[in-house]
Amino acid sequence: LTAITLDDVKAYAKTLYEKVYITGMIHGNWSDKEAMQSVDSLLSALGSKPLPENERFEQVVEVMPQGERFRFSREVADNNNSLAYAIQVGEKDFSLLAKASMIASVVESDFYTQMRTNQQLGYIVWSFNQRIEDRIFFRLVIQSSTHGPFELSKRVNAWMASTEKLFSKLTDQEFERHQQSLIVALEKKGDSIGAIAGDLYSLAADEKGDFRFKKKLIQAVKDLKKEGVAKTAGKIFRDDSTPRLEVLMRAKGSKEKVPEGVITETKKFKNQLN
């Protein structure tokens, strides 16, 4: 950034809209004709050419091979260590997405209590399911100024091994409470025209026009059985064939030894995936 001058920015600004690809969502009391007129006005004002499909941004999700476990580590210019765990759950599927969401709801409190309250590993402790494009992941994140990333990894792996007890002790009433909580969250509508427009935009763009996406997911949550959720949790947390990636960031000046087999260059990681 230090090499960029104001003149560079001004020159680039003139070419910024030469070619564009626009995704939009219009929500409100406009007619189809008024909506099209608005779009035409925008395109006319920009004076742009269409951006070719092969030049448009597309988020590419790398797929980890079955049974593979990757560990990547690097020292950073920060006083904190961190562990970011990404467990590859599978391809987008309403049933699998519902199960992953339910599992996230069940483990959230226990993971936080064990990692932050009981073991006091760090201030930031998160667990959540995540969908990127057509892939579902389960994420575990800890930031710590007192424990190195490889120690964090040991603690998290021990916690994952203990999740069998967490799900075997889950009562029908607790399961139904988590289930109902998810349904209520999915059924909640935006409380402003902007929030509603944002939800509709996500359905139009991210879900490719599937405006019944939430209803389908709600039905998938309603169809869940405790045994099926527990089985999927076992595959996510305790099955050696489930692919996973650990990103272990070491604080500046860290003396923690990097174990053998840990990748320290992004290029090597990419090569192992291909």
Show which residues each predicted segment covers.
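C-terminal regions of mature proteins
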Residues: 1-45, 50-65, 71-77, 86-90, ...
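Long, C-terminal catalytic modules of enzymes
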Residues: 130-137, 149, 153, 164, ...
